[in-house]
Amino acid sequence: YASGLGYYAAGARKFGSAGDFVTAPEMTGLFGQTVAAQVREIMLLSARQIIEVGAGSGRLAADLLLELERLDCLPDQYAILDLSADLRQRQQETIAKAAPHLLDRVVWLDRLPETFSGVVLANELLDALPAEVVAWRENGIFNRGVAVDAAGCFTWSERPASGALLAAAEAIGTKYELPPGFESEISLAARAWSAEWAHRLSCGALLLIDYGFPQREFYHQQRASGTLMCHYRHRAHADPFWLPGLNDITAHVD
């Protein structure tokens, strides 16, 4: 998210055939229509409000609003929380084109609300949050980070894990008997983000859609190199140091 440099802030197209990857809402309106049925059920039991976190191109928001209109269950407000100014502009353009008569129901937030009732929606958000790369070694648990080598190129570097990361890694390593040499990811950011809603959501539900595994499969010994993956122009690879800032870097959800 670094201004002008970060993947989500540099202005290049991310989604669709001209971008790096395709999400379900970009492929068909059926995804939004299906999600709308569940959103309607939740709103009828809580409040007619929606917050979508990380709304991408705005395609899902537009499809949801149109389907909820058809179901006669429009939200009083559809809020979008997105850190990228570039994506905010694209979301406004998408909704204005697809559902101009519903644009006045949409607002953009700069931070999480203190309290909220309704539906919190996030499609492929958690796998885009920062994750720590962890290595279990013979002599301890290490946090893998980035350094610059003698040639001036980015390379992996390790330092002993500490604090909350070490505690989480120790618990996982013990629970699943991870052998030395096992490497994987732990997203403290995803854990913290999810926990925040336990304090802020007074009535409603979180609807989180993403790629991932149950924890016992995420840390299975057949997945000893982790799940970190990069996407560039619809090609997947595992080198986060290639074309820095131009690749979508993701890790599956635990």
Regions found by a protein language model. Name each.
Residues Y1-V53, S57-F116, V134:
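Rossmann-like AdoMet
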Residues V107, P113-D254:
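Class I S-adenosyl-L-methionine
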